Curated annotation (Swiss-Prot):
Pfam families: MerR, MerR-DNA-bind. SUPFAM superfamilies: Putative DNA-binding domain (SSF46955). Keywords: 2Fe-2S, Activator, DNA-binding, Iron, Iron-sulfur, Metal-binding, Transcription, Transcription regulation. The gene is soxR. Activates the transcription of the soxS gene which itself controls the superoxide response regulon. SoxR contains a 2Fe-2S iron-sulfur cluster that may act as a redox sensor system that recognizes superoxide. The variable redox state of the Fe-S cluster is employed in vivo to modulate the transcriptional activity of SoxR in response to specific types of oxidative stress. CDD domains: HTH_SoxR. It comes from the Bacteria. This is Redox-sensitive transcriptional activator SoxR. Transmembrane segments: none annotated. NCBIfam families: SoxR (TIGR01950). Residues 9-77 form the HTH merR-type domain.
Amino acid sequence: MKNSCASRELSVGELARRAGVAVSALHFYETKGLISSQRNAGNQRRFSRETLRRVVVIKVAQRVGIPLAEIARALQTLPAGRSPSAADWARLSAQWKEDLTERIDKLLLLRDQLDGCIGCGCLSLQACPLRNPGDQLSAEGPGAHWLDAEGREHDG
């Protein structure tokens, strides 16, 4: 007999099915403190209905590349005992948009710097610590320094 009461709790299987995640993902989220459950008399996990929306927030955030540690920090700012509201989502997504924009900008810069290495191929350009950080021979300029012009080994 199904309980139609809006406040009823969800089993781990129900929550997994409704959220579109594996049961193991819910267990993982719980061990990371992203969601919580109560145990019933039979020692089975029971999740509040609000947890469904939290899992959806986790999934969306993960899909756009937000690290779980960031998601956990964000979820800690939400009040317990209620589903995240539209205002909660607006606040979280605004912060995540800022972070994503910053990461995208960094990735675009890295991509553009990487293009400069294609012609050289030696990965010892002194202009870019990304390509070869701490290069001992970078003071001698770009290019391979252990080979002479004909490609023979050279005593450094």
